[in-house]
Amino acid sequence: MEISYYEILEITQNADKETIKKAYRKMALKYHPDRNQGDKEAEDKFKLVNEAYEVLSNDEKRAIYDRYGKDALKGGGFGSNSSGFGGFEDLGDIFSSFFGESFGSSSRRRKSSNDEKIPSDFIFNLKLSFKEAVFGCKKNIDFTYKCSCKTCNGTGAKDGKLQTCPKCQGRGQVGVSQGFITFAQTCPDCQGSGEKASEKCNDCKGLGYNESKDSVELNIPEGVDTGMKLRVNAKGNILKNNTRGDMYVKIIAAEDDTFIRDDDDIYIEFPVFFTQAILGQSIKVPTIRGEVTLNLPKGAKDGQRFVLEKEGVKDVHSSRIGNQIVQISIKFPTSLNDEQKELLEKLSESFGIKDGMHQEQKGLFEKIANWFKS
């Protein structure tokens, strides 16, 4: 079932214009591309929010929508505002009206020609084995960084000369239409700067930067995990003013076939023979640091968990050490020789199991029989 424009803006069907405007402001701010870069779902929702506002803020379109639905609006031709911005003069005005100077008009949003084409910092993904992440290690890594082009002063233009971008006319934004809705998007030709090279720099091929290689030895601390970042000072990109940013090393730790890691705790499922569980024997259990002894209680149950304190991972920020949790899985023999079968039959009889039924099972059947009689 298609969601209605009122549901998109989270308002009722009798909402007045002020309520619609406030709802649009809230939803547009939530899903705006500038706040959700790279999020395709947020981008799609932002388009729907704009589409809903375009219709509900226009009395004629809203009346048609309320009576006939969205299909009646296809093809355009409704209302006097053909720009698609709900009565605002340009792409930037709709955002400055709702969000203030932080979004500003299209002319204020335009990037300066002095802006850097590259960020000062960047992220380097480093893959580690399970053991390397748990215990720490030394790693020599080779990486590529960007350096602002000296020839064109980072502009990407020959001799550093730029002209007004013909696609966006210097605004830094262009209008993109979807159906009868038009919304603002960063100009793909000038990346929002409003300026473009008439002729590309021969040195950097119009990119505004060149790439160089570097290497560094890293001391990976004990206890790092996937998603953690280590900052390496002054190993980032080099900007126009010759300052160098930082490199952030993002850890990607591999999983292990035996041990399961959850922050600083280690989990392991360990097989236990049924006689060991019944008798409560001592067993040897592997940990990340070697074998330890686990004393099973008599009658240990399948799936029962036991905590081995301080047998987990050392916390990367402190001296605390996690635990290892051992979950036992009770195993039964799948085949028996004659001697084993005879022994088990005798054991079964010694527990009072006759006619294929244990005393507790008989008691349960008797209870059920009495339930039917009552």
Curated annotation (Swiss-Prot):
Participates actively in the response to hyperosmotic and heat shock by preventing the aggregation of stress-denatured proteins and by disaggregating proteins, also in an autonomous, DnaK-independent fashion. Unfolded proteins bind initially to DnaJ; upon interaction with the DnaJ-bound protein, DnaK hydrolyzes its bound ATP, resulting in the formation of a stable complex. GrpE releases ADP from DnaK; ATP binding to DnaK triggers the release of the substrate protein, thus completing the reaction cycle. PROSITE patterns: DNAJ_1, DNAJ_2, ZF_CR. One of its GO terms (molecular function) is heat shock protein binding. The J domain is necessary and sufficient to stimulate DnaK ATPase activity. Zinc center 1 plays an important role in the autonomous, DnaK-independent chaperone activity of DnaJ. Zinc center 2 is essential for interaction with DnaK and for DnaJ activity. It is found in: Cytoplasm. This is Chaperone protein DnaJ. Its main location: cytoplasm. The keyword Repeat applies.
